[in-house]
Amino acid sequence: MKPTPLLTGWTCRHLGDTAPGKPVTLPHDAMLAEPRTALSAGGTNTGWYEGHDYEYRRTLTVPENELADTHILEFEGVYHNAEVWLNGQKAAFRPYGYTNFYVDCAPYLHAGENELRVIARNADQPNSRWYSGAGIYRPVQLWTARGAHITLNGVKIRTLSLDPAVVEVRVKTTAPGTVRLTVDDLPAMQQESDGEAVFTLTLDNARLWTPETPNLYTCRVSFADDEVTETFGVRKVEWGTDGFLLNGKRYIIQGACIHHDNGLLGAVCDPDAVARKVRLLKENGYNAIRSAHNPCSKALLTECDRQGMLVMDEYIDHWYIHKTEHDYVDYFNDWWRQDLTDMVEKDYNHPCVVLYSTGNEVSETAQKRGIALTKEMTNFLHGLDDSRPVTCGVNIFFNFLSSIGFGVYSDEKAKKEAERAEKAKQRGEKAAKKKAVGSQFFNNLAGLLGDEFMKRGATLHGCDVKTRDAFANMDIAGYNYGIYRYKHDLKKYPQRLILGSETFCNDAYKFRELAKQEPRLVGDFVWAGMDYLGEVMVGSWEYADYAETFDGGPGWVSAGSGRIDLTGKPLGEALYTRVALEADNGPYIAVCPVNHTGDRHSPSAWKMTNAMPSWSWTDCEERKANVEVYARAARVELVLNGHTVGSKTLKNDCLARFSIPYERGTLEAVSYDAADHEIGRCKLQSAGGTTRLTLDAEEPTVKPGHLCYIRLRYTDENGITKPLARGSIQVQVRGGTLVGLGSACPFNKHSYLDSETDTYYGEALAIVRMGDGDAMTIAASDGEYSAELTVPAQA
């Protein structure tokens, strides 16, 4: 079938508005343009954005001679409770906001202009534990075919064996006929189809797909007048007591959890933003992504195939127990089979997908009904695709608490949360007075007590009792924050495979060292790889000069828990995990904000450090500087302006901490092996006295219509960032469109759709969509600094 993108020609308005809708281009996040107020029922979960229902409209023109053709609309993601109307008739309803779905248009079309209307609901707050976005936030396309054709998702490709490489291609057609197939490096072949044709291909000296060598093949299938092109990778996944095997060799999954938003763009699923996210995560040492806590986009799978990134595609955040009052629970029982079917259809041909997850922190797994459901969902996925293992992220401690009446999640708590939000809204009550419940309460408690609270709690005997039956009903046991159980449970359950489905950053080194010894410890996913909107303050160490309050109230917008911040900048924690996971041996230096040494900050268990790679702390001479060095070494030495100021032996971690008086100049870290030979060196240089505004584009040229990321920084004359320089920056764009502007600060009162932003530790980010030619970005700051940058259009 032939796809036609339907990205332009749309309007959007609040449902019920009488004024004409505003023109929008898909993908579109309607929620990002809403005000953020203390009366928002989504509250801390959604970053205080208000929730509304939306109506999208466009015209669909069908010529008379094409009316008898097959017409199928595909929506890759509409949040949520989507209704599709054609010519005044309801053609489809899909409640889940994160799955792609299809609409057969045949019963509703007529020749000429057809009215396509899509309703997306998001006024039913709270309905999510994080920023969901709203509207048609992923692409839409119209699939058409004339006469007999290959069915949608009708080409399925699977690697059967590796030596030699044998690949199976199954093709489903709507009628009998001849199916023709070509694959790179092989002669063309054909078969007769009676509705399905099965090809078995042998590829001599096949180029295997791995994260290190993401080789892809192209498969072209033709039938009648229809043609389908699919890419695939030759790779095989196996799992057992030898661990997780990729192409017959043990492979340690070293992953990061991510949410679906794209930072300053909100939930907009732009292919360029997705490609950038994958690139940044890979550059910082991760080889896998957990799509938390919903099926990922097609764009993400395409990029993970291309760049070499493993994917654990996760279905949902809850089953039949509410986490928020208006979440998906009311639809779950009727829809989970269709949802999983569509997730597998989307994932099947992608070599990057190596795991399916049925859910996240579903305390239902502590109950008899939930244990049976675990098995049912695992078996259902095996029936759709038995080439990939199935897991589920279980918070071991939460399961135990729920079994003794202290559950983090319950229908009653979700209802109370919604009632409190509604009463607060009616009274105009400030957010600070709203009582934290559910996961927010436990996140706050963990923030005060530290990560040990969660990890030690998971060692209680009852945690084993309330998880073992569910773990027996999945291929790989998913442990959320259960690292202190690994050794014990691997010994007690000799057939169990364990995946750290959600972990703290400071456990990366311990995980890596244990995984090298224990094959049945198959992997780890840190929370979180990249910062995200909503679930505010959960991972933030913020100070009073950037955050007006520490209560998570309005103004707070992001979690602050990413190893990479909201603008895509790797933090000290990213440098630590690079070394801990042995992406390289370092050394790296990061420094906690010297101007805040000893100051109180907002609490969080999901933050290991707020250190950053900078030695430019203006007016902080002689203040104590807390310096961190990350290295795989026997010893590290710290040198300031040519003088050794500290030396430490590294034991049981790849992190050494030093406290030294701040002094401008050159700070160096030198790493040594066990024989005291130098094996690595890095340095940070203080910025000079001159301050200027500097604009840097991430790419030297950008294709027309694509995104260009431009970092705005206060620097010295040599381009060294000055983190304590702070101001407001106004941005204009010529030859393009400013589509996002902001900083990484988790507390931010500006809209990311504004043309002005405050800086955060000397930096901000502008996202520009290129026009037809070169694009010029002009920035001015407080009447004192200005700069401009022209990015050439790529031919």
Placement of each model-derived feature along the sequence:
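Short glycine/proline/serine/threonine-rich loop/turn segments at secondary-structure transition edges
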Residues: 66-69, 109-113, 127, 203-216, ...
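Substrate-binding clefts and catalytic carboxylate motifs of secreted carbohydrate-active enzymes
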Residues: 4-5, 11-18, 78, 125, ...
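Short flexible loop/turn segments that cap and initiate beta-strands
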Residues: 179, 212-216, 624-626, 632-634, ...
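Edge beta-strands of extracellular beta-sandwich domains
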Residues: 227-232, 676-688, 785-794
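Beta-strand-rich binding/interaction modules
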Residues: 165-191, 197-199, 625-644, 666-671, ...
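Extended acidic/polar, glycine-enriched regions
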Residues: 110-111, 170-239, 657, 661-665, ...
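Accessory beta-strand-rich segments of carbohydrate-active enzymes
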Residues: 2-16, 30, 46, 51-151, ...
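Active-site-adjacent substrate/metal-binding segments within catalytic domains
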Residues: 35-62, 66-75, 79-86, 92-95, ...
